[in-house]
Amino acid sequence: MDWKLEKISSRRVRGEEDMMWESIMKTLGRDLKWSRKYNMQKMNKTPDGRSSYSRFKRSIMKRRACHVPFASSPVSTKWCQNMDQMQRTGISSSPSEEYCQIPDPLVLLPYLTEIPVVAIRDCDQKLDSLKDISTPKRTQKVLKKLLSKTRLRFLQEQNILQTVEEHKPGPSIRCDNNMQICEKDTCTWKECLQMKKKKSLVQKTQKDNICSRAVLQPEIQLHISGLHNDYYLNLLDWNSENLVAIGLKSTAYIFSGDNRTVTQKIYLPSPATYVSSVSWISNGTCLAIGTSSGEVQLWDIETQKRLRNMLGHMSVVGALNWNHHILSSGSRLGHIHHHDVRIAEHHVGTLQHKQGICSLKWSPCGSKLASGSSDGDLNIWPCDPAGETKPLLNMPHPTAVKAMNWCPWLSDTLGVGGGMKDGLIRIWDTKCGKNIHSANTNSQICSLLWLPQTKELLTGHGPSRNQMTIWQYPSLLKMNDYYGHKGRVLHLALSPDQRRIFSAAANGTANIWKYGN
């Protein structure tokens, strides 16, 4: 049998040049694959296998581009500078023009002004119309993807613009906070109108709780809106000039106890920044304001000027207190800063807690500083701002130490109220660190005040009764309960003549009580 060989196709012989290029491409491919794998591991993973900070930061930035930023962290980003302004009401003279400044305009991110809202509807209509077109499925997917990206880009830039507008500086009109005296029958406040429908029930409830030995009588009722329902803030103070300062969201209101009117308002630049603490200097009209952005501002109420803006904190400043010219401020990161307001380099000392600062109080003689934190630590510090950084005493509590005050007639005695899971009043002797008296209230204690005229103790409570209670000292025998609020009584303040008490509650009400024998 003869075999016939046929040539089916010509054999291709690779030349040296082809082999060289093939080798080069293989080498480059291996190098690129190894390099990308190595770099991704290096960039995205840390030695312990967790995500790196750069990857975490990129994901946060992508979220901010799509959504309004969350206020889930007390740490301040410091991404915008504040320009504050102060305003008087009608009964006051016009503000000083020397301080009035026009804030620099904020540069907005790109905004698609040429794309109306109809553009979004057009994109949706085009997406729906693709279902009826007899085109290949792959082509439909590509077109849908392109139209979806156009719609998403438009919505993202709209969200970014809204975020920037929230931080836009300037004296914008604030509708989220207000303060006015209740006019009883003619009052037009929303909550007051609702209460009129239940008037008979309210009167009966109050009548049943009136006691013959009552020493507190309601004198003025105020409606307030914008008071943060935050247990860890200190938003009320009454000074020696009979002026009450109260923080309502991004505005500090100044209420005159003599005229019984709101005389001044101090605005923070943006609704995103709120007043977190207020404190008057011992003698004078200098007001310290702590903000949620970590700033401590000093204002002179008489001249209507901001004296200075002291930086240093990186989180919410929830507590302030004065000791002559030394201002102490506490933040939610657990730092306590001492500021000497007389000098340019104001920061003269720092103290440290493990958790956030809830309260700061200097003793009446100014020799000791008491600080309470959210983890239940109560520390007593010496009066040496630039020196010793270790506490004299540490007295642990089962809950946060927020309701705290020094006894005005016993300089070494400190009263502390327990939180939700505690409810105990504890009286401490700070000389030896002993708990000398205690009483169970069966309720959260939100505020605590000493009453010098009758040598008694007043506490403001939370759920479920939201009452104010007077206790006899030192026996801590309950004298009477007072019901003037439907929300927890977060703040209490005593007038300079010690005859009136200002109470502010979470339900948007504030009362001025007449106090005496």
From Swiss-Prot:
Its main location: cytoplasm. GO terms for biological process: anaphase-promoting complex-dependent catabolic process; cell division; de novo centriole assembly; positive regulation of anaphase-promoting complex-dependent catabolic process. Keywords: Cell cycle, Cell division, Cytoplasm, Repeat, WD repeat. It is found in: Cytoplasm. It holds the Pfam family WD40_CDC20-Fz. Protein regulator of centriole-deuterosome disengagement and subsequently participates in the ciliogenesis in multiciliated cells (MCCs). This is Cell division cycle protein 20 homolog B. It comes from Xenopus laevis.
